[in-house]
From Swiss-Prot:
It comes from Lachnoclostridium phytofermentans (strain ATCC 700394 / DSM 18823 / ISDg). This is Protein translocase subunit SecA. Belongs to the SecA family. May bind 1 zinc ion per subunit. Pfam families: P-loop_SecA, SEC-C, SecA_DEAD, SecA_PP_bind, SecA_SW. It is a peripheral membrane protein. Its cofactor is Zn(2+). ATP binds at residues 85, 103-107, 511. PROSITE patterns: SECA, SECA_MOTOR_DEAD.
Length: 858
């Protein structure tokens, strides 16, 4: 393999070779562009648009368009794009991922494909990881686009619908991945076309593409409302969890399994940190049964107790404060494992968040009901074309290609990387490692060399901060607790003598520029205090030093007590190093170590990829169903032939009722008309079906269906005649159908969740869980479609002209993952309330509860 690479070069080198001629042509146009006046340069935009209308393609005008953008950036920002940025811009236009090192100017690179693709007039979305970067880039890079006559918008969390609509209608829109995803979901919940804010998803340029499409791929975007479920069980389970004793389980060897040895478990429960799972022992099950006064915890009616006690134990033994979450203002806030940022509004699902709230003695919020949901994988695959930029993507190249169909091309740096990446410094214990880290910081600080210390948890950053205070070393801490000061702290991290401690540096988005005299001192020194489970995150930390050919150095300090080493095979290493009799504090150097670390990281990366791939396979079923529902919903929203749709629903309902109550092989005298009436009349309030003997003898089932269809259609035509303007009824039909679709779809999402949670049991029956999930999911989907038809006809057949159609605004989402929407106040009516046993106001002669009171009111 190494020989082939030497002869033919890497994949990236071969691809770069192919696009260099295009970049050379752009370079050659620079003198011509410099001669143009501002107005002439601006006029090129109209010229390009006309050329596209006349049949030219984007590829035809790419060279000239990129030369125009380069000159515009020089005049507005004072920045002349490097040759490598032109290469990156060409790769992005091709719908690929451009891997560009930190400090190589990814932000400016994005202006090239953004301008070119915006000329089509269908909108370009530039996706950033936070509001700060979206606003900054829209103002900063927006200058280039505005100079060239394009409109630039920015979506921020606190914007209303009118502001969002205006921003999405711009040629180029900057927004976070979360805002885009939520706006897409909200657009598929609106009742009126005028409430839509987005255009079609045309072209997306994703900054920090690995963070968005890989790190956040497992977290679905969820819009949710409050459910009526009590929170007392969480509090009760938390009390019990504190009383249970943690035990251990002996891992069975192959010989034990052959000899049919039983698991040797102690205590009430055991924790498996590798699998992030908790299991009750037989003793623990008995204690739970005694506590809740139940006979058998495994009974179906006790599944909720079983689920909640496991959640409480997970909250206590697998979720750590200041690592996985922080408590701020009487609220539990999640910390992003990859970026170290707080994620306001995001809540763990399946009740885990409530279990943590009970553990931390803050107010336990009620569980929420999912109204709409989508994963980033499926959302970004909806774009006609997408591309991405990042400093580190090659380690996940296979995943990008397999799941997103995106190629990764490494762009060469503008200047050679001068940073020195040292081998890992390995110690036996955490105490020895921390001493070595502090000594390295003190030494660099004395020399005036700036130091950036990267930690994995908030707890670790605060521990190092305390140790530095004892040494009187001035420093700044950047973690999820203090992220408001983020940009300011990072901007100063390259100054002489600066010491900065930061939790994961992924997606920080701010360059660290070296202060005066720092280059001579060796540049920025990076110290990693622990290896992350992803090599990519380690590379991102390293990449903060040595930008644009600056000097720098990086080194990771690790010990055999670190989580990564502890969980993945350090026991054997520990035994070996103990036997060597090394004195305390001495650094261990052994070729086995680097191999063990690399192997552990690769193992976790492969495992995480497997989880994401598995999630996508299950979500594919949900996605296909979502596509159908949202497409049908959009047709209704646009008002496409509503009358025909409703009449078909009415006739379909008649046919379903007849086919269900009367089988094909029954003789007419065997027909159960009472059952038919029982099914049909609550939906379509027609006269009961009564046939005399002589009528029955000469009637076929198809004739009965035809007769009932005619009656039902006539009944609805009479309803139609009650409306002075036909468009009023069409409006009512639209609103009723949309609300029924939304209600049934929300229930279906819950049902699919329940199915997903229980589908693993199918494996015990020698059946493939994924196949069963797909089969059962589509059966449930068919049932939902039939229910939508039935409920819509039922509601419309009972609608009255005096009833006002209420416009309903969709709940605004203010979170990164979930929205705990406040329940809406009921709509007040001026009319007198009708009691269930009163005569129905519609004049049918029936009691209200058996007539209009039995159907959904509008």
């Amino acid at each position: 393999m190494g020989l082939i690479k030497k002869i033919f070069g890497t994949h990236s080198e071969r691809e770069i070779k192919l696009i260099r001629p295009t970049a050379d042509k752009i370079e050659a146009l620079e003198p011509d562009m410099m001669k143009l006046s501002d107005d002439e340069l601006r006029g090129k935009t109209i010229e390009f648009k006309n050329r596209l209308k006349n049949g030219e393609t984007l590829d035809d005008i790419l060279v000239e368009a990129y030369a125009v953008v380069r000159e515009a950036a020089k005049r507005t920002l004072g920045n002349r794009a490097y040759y490598v940025q032109l290469l990156g811009g060409i790769i992005l236009h091709q719908g690929r991922i451009s891997e560009m090192r930190t400090g190589e100017g990814k932000t400016l690179t994005s202006t090239f494909p953004a301008y070119l693709n915006a000329l089509e007039g269908e909108g370009v979305h530039i996706v950033t990881v936070n509001d700060y970067l979206a606003k900054r880039d829209a103002e900063w890079m927006g200058e280039v686009h505005r100079f060239l006559g394009l409109s630039v918008g920015c979506i921020l969390n606190d914007m209303d619908n009118d502001e969002r609509r205006k921003a999405y209608n711009c040629d180029i829109t900057y927004a976070t991945n979360n805002e885009l995803g939520f706006d897409y979901l909200r657009d598929n919940m609106v009742i009126y076309k005028e409430q839509l804010v987005m255009r079609d998803l045309h072209f997306a340029i994703i900054d920090e593409v690995d963070s968005v499409l890989i790190d956040e791929a497992r977290t679905p975007l969820i819009i949710s409302g409050q459910s009526g479920k009590s929170t007392r069980l969480y509090e009760a389970c938390d009390i019990l969890a504190r009383q249970l004793t943690k035990g251990t389980a002996k891992e069975l060897s192959k010989m034990d399994i052959i000899m049919k040895e039983d698991d040797q478990e102690t205590g009430d429960f055991v924790v498996n940190e590798k699998e992030k799972a908790v299991n009750l022992t037989a003793e623990g099950v008995e204690k739970v049964e005694r506590f809740f006064k139940i006979e058998n915890l495994a009974d179906p009616e006790n599944l909720e107790i079983q689920h909640n006690i496991i959640l409480a134990l997970r909250a206590h033994y697998l979720m750590a404060i200041d690592k996985d979450y922080v408590v701020k203002d009487d609220e539990v806030l999640i910390v992003d494992d990859f970026t170290g940022r707080i994620m306001p509004g995001r809540r763990y699902s399946d009740g885990l968040h409530q279990a943590i709230e009970a553990k931390e003695h803050v107010k336990v919020k009620r569980e929420s009901k999912t109204l709409a949901t989508i994963t980033f994988q499926n959302f970004f695959n909806k774009y006609t074309k997408k591309c991405g930029m990042t400093g580190t993507a090659l380690t996940e190249e296979n995943e990008f290609r397999e799941i997103y169909g995106m190629d990764v091309v490494e762009v060469p740096t503008n200047r050679p990387v001068a940073r020195i990446d040292k081998d890992d410094a390995v110690y036996r214990t955490k105490r020895e490692k921390l001493n070595a880290v502090i000594n390295a910081i003190v030494e660099a600080h004395k020399a005036g060399q700036p130091v950036l210390v990267g930690t994995i948890t908030i707890e670790a950053s605060e521990e190092i901060s305390e140790l530095l205070k004892k040494k009187n070393i001035p420093h700044k801490v950047l973690n999820a607790k203090f992220h408001e000061l983020e940009a300011e702290i990072i901007a100063d991290a390259g100054q002489k003598g600066a010491v900065t401690i930061a939790t994961n540096m992924a997606g920080r988005g701010t360059d660290i520029k070296l202060g005066e005299g720092v280059t001579e001192l060796g540049g920025l020194k990076i110290i990693g205090t622990e290896r992350h489970e992803s090599r990519r995150i380690d590379n991102q930390l390293r990449g903060r030093s040595g930008r644009q050919g600056d000097p720098g150095e990086s080194c990771f300090y690790i010990c055999l007590e670190d989580d990564l080493m502890r969980l993945f095979g350090s026991e054997r290493l520990n035994t070996i190093f103990k036997s060597l009799g090394l004195p305390e504090g001495e650094q261990i150097e052994h070729k086995m170590l680097s191999g063990a670390i690399e192997k552990a990281q690769k193992k976790i990366e492969d495992n995480n990829f497997g989880i994401r791939k598995n999630l996508l396979e299950y979500d594919k079923v949900n996605n296909e169903q979502r596509e159908i529902i949202y497409a049908e919903r959009r047709k209704v929203l646009n008002g496409d032939s509503m009358r025909d749709v409703i009449f078909k629903m009415i006739t379909d309902n008649v046919e379903t009722c007849v086919n269900t109550s009367i089988s094909d092989d029954q003789l007419p005298e065997e027909w159960d008309l009472a059952e038919l009436n029982q099914m049909l009349l609550p939906i379509i309030p027609m006269e009961p079906v009564e046939l005399k003997d002589n009528e029955l003898r000469h009637m076929k089932r198809n004739e009965l269906i035809h007769m009932l269809k005619e009656k039902a259609v006539k009944l609805y035509e009479e309803k139609e005649a009650e409306f002075p303007e036909k468009e009023h009824l069409r409006e009512v039909e639209r609103v009723v159908l949309l609300r029924v679709i939304d209600r049934k779809w929300m229930d279906h999402i819950d049902d699919m969740d329940q199915l997903r949670q229980g589908i693993g049991l199918q494996a015990y029956g020698q059946r493939d869980p994924k196949t069963e999930y797909k089969f059962s999911g589509f059966e449930m989907f068919d049932t939902m479609i039939n229910a939508i038809t039935e409920d819509t006809v039922k509601a419309l057949m009972h609608v009255r002209i005096e009833q006002k159609v209420e416009r309903e605004e969709v709940a605004k989402v203010t979170g990164t993952n979930r929205d705990e929407s406040v329940a809406k106040a009921p709509v007040k009516r001026a009319t007198k309330k009708v009691q269930p046993n009163d005569p129905c106001p519609c004049g049918s002669g029936k009691k209200y509860k058996h007539c209009c009171g039995g159907v959904g009111r509008i």
